[in-house]
From Swiss-Prot:
Its EC number is 3.5.1.88. Keywords: Hydrolase, Iron, Metal-binding, Protein biosynthesis. The gene is def. This is Peptide deformylase. HAMAP family: Pep_deformylase (MF_00163). Transmembrane segments: none annotated. GO terms for biological process: co-translational protein modification; translation. It holds the Pfam family Pep_deformylase. PANTHER family: PEPTIDE DEFORMYLASE. GO terms for molecular function: metal ion binding; peptide deformylase activity. NCBIfam families: pept_deformyl (TIGR00079). The keyword Ribosomal protein does not apply. InterPro entries: Peptide_deformylase, Peptide_deformylase_sf.
Amino acid sequence: MYNIKFLDLLNSNLKPNPQWIFKDPHPILREVTQDIEGNELSKDDIYYLKKMVRYIDVCYHNQAKKYKIRSGIAIAANQVGWNKRATYIHFNDEAKEHHYLLINPHIIKRSSEIAYLNPGEGCLSVDDDRSGYVIRNKKVHVKAYDLISEQFIDQEFSGIIAICIQHEIGHLDAGLYYDNINQQQPFYADPSWTKIGR
């Protein structure tokens, strides 16, 4: 559909560095990103996609220390200064590999059940980690185009991948994870909520 293949994004000699990541409180992190229109990505668009893929894949292959960057499992476009609706996710959850490059992702339905990651979440754009449980939906239904599988997805996610997707789409909607922490009782958890993690 788009004028670039995922494999073309991998052929990159880019060397990630900490300056790639826009940090809180940079205003771009509080701007709602724009949908990518049409199917012709510009050279600048492709460059940003390459940066996103390169940064996270370096982390996936345990090379973050080599480049002196903070390790992460996913990244949103505005974290590298690109005000467009895209996110790259690459991590293993037990025996399953989660690998998506989502264009124009939108959450169209959320479960009423609540989940949270234990002990909490972190973010490449937030150096001052905020302690507390980040309140998320247990399941989310997402529509997007996945550049890796080259197809539209219209599916429900649960577990840690659902937490990750909500974190990244939160970025695209001008949010940061700590917006969803109970400021009065950061580690409050209702017994009905699902704890994900140890």
